[in-house]
Amino acid sequence: MYPVDLHMHTVASTHAYSTLSDYIAQAKQKGIKLFAITDHGPDMEDAPHHWHFINMRIWPRVVDGVGILRGIEANIKNVDGEIDCSGKMFDSLDLIIAGFHEPVFAPHDKATNTQAMIATIASGNVHIISHPGNPKYEIDVKAVAEAAAKHQVALEINNSSFLHSRKGSEDNCRAVAAAVRDAGGWVALGSDSHTAFSMGEFEECLKILDAVDFPPERILNVSPRRLLNFLESRGMAPIAEFADL
């Protein structure tokens, strides 16, 4: 069990079923020390309003010994790497994930998908690319992994991709993990929980990493401090309340 989960959704994304309090309770039971709530960006049909993300600044940092990161799973909007996160939203958020979602950016050819993903990586606005192994969006995996390593952006291995969504992701995710390994980049593990009961579940992710002998020192979820060091290296100010996690 890794003590950090970086991708989950609450009832604010109406196709998910748990509250912030539900996740805190599960984190305590499962030994999760730090997690990020990453509801969908506002361009998705059932996503929260942009004020939802701005108002995350009122959240407590730590509840019952569990640290809470304020995040978003933004949508890649176009080949220029624009995402549906801007202005005051950036000021309130600790963690910005971005990925392809069909209602916002339909699948294109390999070159177009790759251009959009690399532009997003190079924008400086995101920390993690979500489910880059989605088989509906063919990409140049090597080029994406090299860009991600260059710009200190992690590529996600998403546990839900092997269980509930994005069927047929296994081969692509092995290729992503191997390319990140070779490029010297970072991998982030995400449960992509839409109910609190699955938070912290990375069993399928770990099968992928084991298959390519991925170095554990390049996995962000190994400890809260590793993840926080990564975010601070990207410009996040140290969060005093997280010092003892």
UniProtKB/Swiss-Prot annotation:
EC identifiers of the protein: 3.1.3.-
Alphabetically ordered keywords of this record: Hydrolase, Metal-binding, Zinc
Binding site for Zn(2+) 3: E73, H101, H131
A GO MF term: phosphatase activity
UniProt remark on cofactor binding: Binds 3 Zn(2+) ions per subunit.
Residues that, per the record, bind Zn(2+) 1: H7, H9, E73, D192
Family: Belongs to the PHP family.
Protein name (database record): Probable phosphatase YcdX
